[in-house]
Amino acid sequence: RSCLPGIGGMRLTGLKDWVQNTTFFVHGLVYPLGPLIGEIVERWGWQDLTLVQMSAAVVLVVGVFLAVRGREWRWVTAGLWWWLCGALPSIVALPFSYLYISPRLLMLASVGIVTVWALLVDGVASLFQDVRLGRAVGLFLAGSIVLSNGVFLGRQRGLFIALNDVYQDLLLAAAPREHEPLAIVNLPTALASQRKTYAMILENVIFIPWYSNVSEFIEVNIGYRDAEAAIFTPVRAETEDVFGAAGEGLNWEGIRSFATIHRTVWLARYDAGRYRLDEVGSVLTATQQPVNDALVDFGGGARIEAAAALRSDDGRWRIVLDWWAAGPVDGEIFVHVRDRNDMLVGQIDGPALGGMVPIWMWERGDRIRDIRYIGDLEGDQPFRVQVGIYNESGRLPAWMSGIRCPDDAASVVVLEQ
């Protein structure tokens, strides 16, 4: 197509990578040996390109032997010709960095690959004088190939499900208009497994490509929403599967500013083998000091105006703390859950908004909605949620209705399962 007059110029971008590109498609030709090659690479650190080339040489020798023995030259050469015709345009036109993340291009040569391996399996089976034994060997070889395909598809499906869950959460979060503009933090755009079924094929799933953004994803699914994504590494956990996140990387000051210009803040987290998107709160700036008495007053620096708790659809407790700040506070927030016997059964300490807006960064007039989550609790009900602030000198005084709280831990809400 590129050579047709008036259509476009032909760019041979892949010529500089022709060795790697050819080896990539040779890997496709010998793909049933891919799991074995990958195991050798992982266990002994051999070079995958070299192993693919060695495997191709072995397959070629076996193929020639079987073709000579069975007089199948026409079918063998037809399969190889189809493979070459399907692979050659990509070999000369695309860089290796593109091929490596695009195993779908192997489908261009798939008819030739299947033809070659059908002849190889049939040829090996025909070496046995016992017809039933030959059929059993043929079925075993074909079944091994199908099994490796199933493993590959299973891993791809696992990656897709892991990302699909968090994107379903995203669409649910974006559905109500009152949530926008939305701030989405650490949203994984792509997921790749560090383990490989086939040596030279990267197993990955991409939900938002580099040329798009979270707002466009929402728009094509439910309609336009004002949404923006960012990356904040201090609350980004490392996982076995490597993922890329949407948005620009921000520091502490940047993430606070990012939160203040959006109505709701949502944080993507990895928890118990899955990614989830949680609403973690909001920050309003330059608000007036409330005239009503605070639920909890921590010596004038910060106060809790209200607190509530309810069960989320996923079974976790969703604890909401509404703070008002008179200025930055030298300290950290603790949130403890105690049972009827005053035993500690859970804690969700740390900065507000999922760990992104610490109390020492609060400014006068900030109204912070701090949403935290905790799973199932064990112990005697009811459970009490206690909140306090501490620093190197100890806990800050906590006052409720003019009375200082025992241990400076204010019981703000009760949980009953």
Predicted features by range, described:
Residues 1-225, 240, 247, 261, ...:
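Polytopic membrane enzymes that build or remodel cell-surface glycoconjugates and lipids
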Residues 172-182, 186-417:
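C-terminal luminal/periplasmic domains and tails of membrane-associated envelope-modifying transferases
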